[in-house]
């Protein structure tokens, strides 16, 4: 554990896009609802409400598949400008309590309230106040996790969803990590989980007791990362947007995909709108230098392509996708990511858009 005990809050809006639609249209509140593309245009689901999730509908699922699982599903097109506006209102609420805010997307953020004087510095009371403000002012619900380290705050925010709060106090960190199923740790996907299980590793305590060198040999960076997390160590700071050199979004598929068309649907209908929204919200005045695509294959090999391009353009990602898939070699795809490198405010620096520790 770090010497300085931090107070980290992870706030995650509940089914954000769908929740905004239900708020603005009462007729949607009691039905299975999804925001996404039309099945006739080979659309994909961006998000869905909890009624739809009961039928197995999930984000990034083809709309046609979602309708097979839930024939009564009502699919509406996204209103990104509205979601951006609501996200800005949420950010304004965050700023009442701390300036150390790391937005992860329109509906999710880390907050470091270690030095906040609100509510006598109680992170639990601050998290409760944030959730209350969001409900009273925006008529939307948020879930939150509080912990001394980032990854546990994120894990905790999912434990009492929807509209819940979960607090991990410093003295409970190791106990929670020991009992935590590895699939609950951010960055552990389906294929990695199978390999971990084959090695006899199921919960944090299994990793903590494992030999570090063997973990590193078998699992590389993932093994090193899991070993640290299993000891309650996560040294990452809450990084504010003004410190960022790039903006990126990515998605790990619940089932691997293989074709260009499948990749392009997800880029066009999910990843690109999210990247555009995040860029315009966080950095409306800063230009970009490069666009890039990252692909992780089923064998966990990863490749990226980034080219100089001075404006965010969907068509340019089409070109990059064509180029990056020449490296596919028949492999299925488990993750897609898009990124742009921002133009520095003071001087140009030669930095990779996909830093080794930024996309895990």
UniProtKB/Swiss-Prot annotation:
A single MF term (Gene Ontology): DNA-directed DNA polymerase activity
EC class of the enzyme, as a word: transferase
UniProt-listed InterPro entries: DNA/RNA_pol_sf, DNA_pol_Y-fam_lit_finger_sf, DNA_pol_Y-fam_little_finger, DNA_polymerase-Y, DNApol_IV, PolY_HhH_motif, Rev_trsase/Diguanyl_cyclase, UmuC
Span of domain UmuC: 8-189
Subcellular location: Cytoplasm
Key words of the record: Cytoplasm, DNA damage, DNA repair, DNA replication, DNA-binding, DNA-directed DNA polymerase, Magnesium, Metal-binding, Mutator protein, Nucleotidyltransferase, Transferase
Gene Ontology annotations for the cellular component aspect, listed alphabetically: cytoplasm
Catalyzed reaction equations: DNA(n) + a 2'-deoxyribonucleoside 5'-triphosphate = DNA(n+1) + diphosphate
The protein's required cofactors: Mg(2+)
Signal peptide: none
Listed GO biological process terms: DNA-templated DNA replication; error-prone translesion synthesis; SOS response
Family, similarity comment: Belongs to the DNA polymerase type-Y family.
NCBIfam families registered for this protein in UniProt: PRK02406.1
Functional summary from the UniProt entry: Poorly processive, error-prone DNA polymerase involved in untargeted mutagenesis. Copies undamaged DNA at stalled replication forks, which arise in vivo from mismatched or misaligned primer ends. These misaligned primers can be extended by PolIV. Exhibits no 3'-5' exonuclease (proofreading) activity. May be involved in translesional synthesis, in conjunction with the beta clamp from PolIII.
Name of the protein in its database record: DNA polymerase IV
Protein's gene: dinB
